[in-house]
């Protein structure tokens, strides 16, 4: 059983690692980040990374291991959201470390961190996948995932 635990600890979880990287960047600004803001920054980091050709389909296949879902306030990675839901609308204060493999995305992340979260929510609501599935949202959530193609389409249509 202990061996299983250690294997779990070493398992790569790229979306969670990207979330930790974003949190660390936000903490470095001294402002921190809320759970809602984290979700929007994660989403738009991927969208803008595709647009700037820093992220390609292979990167997505290797790193997009936890899907976003269509929720009231835009795309949400459910397991990451639930991990930080204890903070409510407050700043996440658990210290996190940046991951070198995501450093190419730092300019995008830093720019997104400067934007108002309400603006990011509104922008995410303009994307076709969210618009076409908004009616599936019940009590703020849906089980409609964003597939790789949905992310690529969002990046291409919002240039």
Give the location of each predicted region:
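Domain-edge interaction signal
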Residues: 1-159
């Amino acid at each position: 059983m202990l061996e299983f635990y250690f294997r779990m600890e070493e398992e790569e979880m790229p979306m969670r690692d990207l979330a930790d990287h974003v949190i660390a960047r936000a903490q470095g600004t001294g402002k921190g980040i809320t759970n809602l803001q984290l979700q929007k920054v994660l989403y738009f980091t991927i969208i803008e990374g595709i647009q700037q050709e820093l992220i390609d389909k292979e990167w997505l296949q290797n790193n997009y291991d936890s899907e976003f879902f269509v929720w009231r306030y835009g795309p949400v990675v459910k397991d990451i959201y639930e991990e930080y839901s204890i903070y409510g609308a407050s700043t996440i204060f658990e210290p996190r470390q940046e991951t070198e493999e995501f450093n190419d995305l730092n300019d995008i992340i830093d720019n997104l961190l400067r934007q108002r979260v309400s603006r990011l929510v509104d922008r995410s609501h303009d994307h076709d996948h969210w618009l076409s599935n908004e009616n599936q949202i019940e009590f703020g959530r849906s089980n409609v995932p964003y597939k790789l193609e949905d992310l690529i389409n969002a990046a291409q249509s919002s240039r």
